[in-house]
C-alpha cells in the first residue's frame, strides 16, 4: 500500500505558506460579474436554463482558469472574495453563483426533487426525525464529509447570528496519516461501508454501499 501522492495532501501550515488558494476580485472583475448577472436575469430564463451564453464573461476568464487549475491540480479548493452580492437580492444572487459555476463544470442533480442548487438554512427540523431532511436544512453541526460532485460551491449571503462556520480538511492527508500510523485500518477503509442515502433518490436503496477511501 502506498500513500496518495497528490497536491491535495496539505496541512494548515501549507495553506499559511502558500496562498494560491485565495482569489480576490478587483473592481473590474466585480463590474463584469454585475453586468453578467444583470444580463442573465434580464433574459427571463429560468435559473437552470442559464448557460455561459446568458452569463458572458471576458476579462475574468483568465482568473477562472486559474481557479479551475487550483481545483484540479492544486490544493483542491479556493476562497473567492469580494463577490458583489450587495447589488442583488437573494434570488438574483443565485443567478450569479449559477452563472460562474457554468465556467467551472456541469450541474448535477442533488436529490430526488431534481434540485441543482440548495439554500442552506435552518428549517427547524432534524436529520434524526425523518429521512427526507438533510443537514443543510438544520442548525445541526455537520461532520467532515465529501459530496458526490467533483466540485461544489458555497456562497455566503450574510453572516449567521450564531455558528455557520465552514471547516476544511484534506482527505488525502487524512488517508496518508492513517496509512503511516495504522496501515491495517487503511486497508479496511477501502472496503465497502453502508451509508444512509437520506432518500435522495426514490429509486435508490435506503443505504448505499461504498468505500470510505477510493484510489
Can you name each region flagged by the protein language model?
Residues 91-98, 168-170:
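"Short basic amphipathic alpha-helical interaction patches in structured regions
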Residues 95-108:
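A short alpha->loop->secondary-structure connector
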Residues 1-66, 73, 78, 85-87, ...:
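Active-site environment of non-heme Fe oxygenases that use a 2-His-1-carboxylate facial triad
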Amino acid at each position: 500500500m502506498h500513500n496518495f501522492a497528490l497536491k491535495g495532501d496539505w496541512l494548515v501550515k501549507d495553506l499559511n505558506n502558500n496562498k494560491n488558494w485565495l482569489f480576490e476580485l478587483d473592481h473590474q472583475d466585480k463590474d463584469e460579474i454585475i453586468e453578467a448577472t444583470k444580463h442573465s436575469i434580464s433574459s427571463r430564463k429560468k435559473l437552470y436554463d442559464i448557460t455561459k451564453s446568458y452569463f458572458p464573461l471576458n476579462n475574468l476568464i483568465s482568473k477562472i482558469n486559474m481557479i479551475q487549475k487550483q481545483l484540479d491540480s492544486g490544493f483542491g479548493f479556493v476562497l473567492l472574495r469580494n463577490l458583489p452580492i450587495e447589488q442583488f437580492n437573494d434570488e438574483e444572487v443565485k443567478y450569479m453563483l449559477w452563472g460562474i459555476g457554468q465556467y467551472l463544470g456541469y450541474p448535477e442533480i442533488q436529490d430526488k426533487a431534481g434540485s441543482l442548487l440548495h439554500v442552506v438554512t435552518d428549517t427547524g427540523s432534524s436529520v434524526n426525525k425523518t429521512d427526507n431532511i438533510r443537514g443543510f436544512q438544520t442548525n445541526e453541526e455537520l461532520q467532515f464529509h465529501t459530496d458526490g460532485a467533483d466540485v461544489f460551491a458555497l456562497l455566503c449571503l450574510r453572516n449567521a447570528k450564531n455558528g455557520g462556520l465552514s471547516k476544511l480538511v484534506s482527505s488525502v492527508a487524512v488517508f496518508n496519516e492513517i496509512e503511516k500510523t495504522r496501515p491495517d485500518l487503511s486497508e479496511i477503509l477501502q472496503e465497502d461501508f453502508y451509508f444512509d442515502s437520506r432518500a435522495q433518490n426514490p429509486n435508490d436503496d435506503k443505504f448505499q454501499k461504498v468505500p470510505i477511501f477510493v484510489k
